[in-house]
């Protein structure tokens, strides 16, 4: 669903870099937990790797310009542009090591960045503001939004069986349709919380009690 763990790649080849890393990666907002990418789209599969302290995230390149999260706190990050050679083999086209000093350690969980996109004028943001008006604590606000989501969005099993692996939720469309999968629930919840300045992380992975790949939230 847009980000993958290292184990999904059979071979990752570090070879000669071809693209100029300074042109690929926009570092103007790294202290806000955001790295911009600027990549001409090609026919072959392309991914961005973001790595820190042994933990790695991979993102499919969907558009020529995008914003990706630096969500592992302050420190040294390795950023790399990967291009598919064949099958599950990827070569490093360009890479750059950067020092990130976040303005706030949770700041990336307030941003509109993949896979949680939102705007102040969006339905999700307006609804979050309406639901939490006159509430005096973040806990009350988080609970109010949670209750709304679980009572107004129905789990869509049909969608799950027909979903592409590069799917990214449109939170306003999910709210309007009243249907979604776990990824949708988590994206809507994170977007609504972020819009009212509550840091929220969207987590993806496996749980012991759930067979399929799953999504959930961490709220700070």
Task: Show the residue positions of the predicted features.
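N-terminal start-of-chain detector that recognizes signal peptides
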Residues: 20-22, 50-53, 172-173, 187-192
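Generic detector of short, locally flexible boundary/turn motifs and exposed helical patches
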Residues: 43-46, 165-168, 180-186, 194
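N-terminal accessory/pre-domain segments preceding catalytic cores
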Residues: 2-139
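Secondary-structure boundary elements
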Residues: 110-177, 188-190
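Solvent-exposed loop/turn segments at secondary-structure junctions
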Residues: 152-155, 179-182, 207-210
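Short, solvent-exposed coil/turn segments
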Residues: 32, 168, 212-213
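Hydrophobic/aromatic-rich core segments of domains that either
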Residues: 184-220
């Amino acid at each position: 669903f847009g980000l993958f763990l290292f184990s999904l790649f059979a071979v990752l080849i570090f070879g000669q870099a071809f693209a100029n890393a300074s042109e690929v990666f926009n570092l103007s907002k790294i202290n806000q937990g955001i790295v911009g990418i600027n990549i001409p789209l090609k026919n072959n599969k392309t991914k961005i790797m973001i790595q820190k302290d042994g933990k790695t995230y991979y993102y499919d390149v969907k558009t020529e310009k995008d914003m990706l999260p630096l969500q592992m706190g302050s420190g040294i990050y390795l950023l790399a542009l990967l291009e598919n050679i064949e099958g599950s083999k990827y070569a490093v086209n360009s890479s750059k090591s950067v020092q990130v000093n976040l303005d706030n350690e949770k700041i990336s969980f307030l941003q509109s960045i993949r896979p949680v996109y939102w705007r102040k004028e969006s339905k999700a943001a307006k609804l979050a503001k309406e639901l939490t008006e006159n509430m005096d604590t973040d806990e009350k606000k988080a609970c109010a939004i949670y209750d709304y989501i679980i009572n107004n969005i129905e789990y869509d099993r049909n969608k799950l069986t027909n979903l592409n692996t590069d799917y990214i939720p449109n939170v306003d469309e999910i709210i309007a349709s009243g249907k979604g999968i776990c990824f949708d629930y988590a994206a809507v919840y994170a977007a609504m919380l972020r819009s009212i300045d509550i840091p929220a992380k969207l987590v993806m992975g496996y749980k012991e009690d759930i067979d399929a790949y799953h999504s959930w939230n961490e709220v700070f």
